[in-house]
Amino acid sequence: MALRLLDFADEWDSRLVTDAVDWLATVAPAEGGAAFVEPSVAEGPHAPWWVPEQGHPASLIQTGQIAGVLYARGFSHPWLDRATEVMWSRIETLSAPSGYEMFGVLAFLQHVPDRARATAAFARVGPLLLAGGLVALDPSAGGEVHSPLAFAPLPSSLARGLFSEAVIEAHLDHLAGAQGEDGGWMFNWPSWSAAAEADWRGFLTVDALRVLRANGRA
């Protein structure tokens, strides 16, 4: 979340990011990349779904999203080299991803420098979004669902071509209308603490404004 906010706000600090990725390399799984959560999460309060995976494997969710924003910023680091190997290996065998895993996959494919390989990989895994029922095409769908804008937030997004213009416009209308009285946006998954809710609402508000602006909804 932190790296993405630095990117969204155009407050990228190369020294700060280098320190963060240096640390990330010290806790990386044996194969490279980033775990979903570190075992140390158990030492304090945390979301109930923050459960360390047995064997400390790399996570598509975390590895892909971190690698994606680093590539978008032209960042280089040995951690990123190994993370890239992990992502290509996982994407080659991807068959039934979760929606959250696809966030990582798409972030990586959107920005990885090998564009020919990324385009070919997306042609295979992109349709899994629809085939796997990972996207709620109805803007009014309730529960913990993923909007097309979650996977294709910008006109330049790789996944934008999977959805009709009418679907995108309907979801933009819904996003604009979901702004709360305090000016912020709320998430659609369980809120387990006031602190976490404040953190996520802040992030999603910045993201919602970014998406609306990029799609001509000033």
Task: For each feature predicted by the language model, list its residue ranges.
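Preference for long, amphipathic alpha-helical scaffolds in soluble/luminal domains
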Residues: 1-218
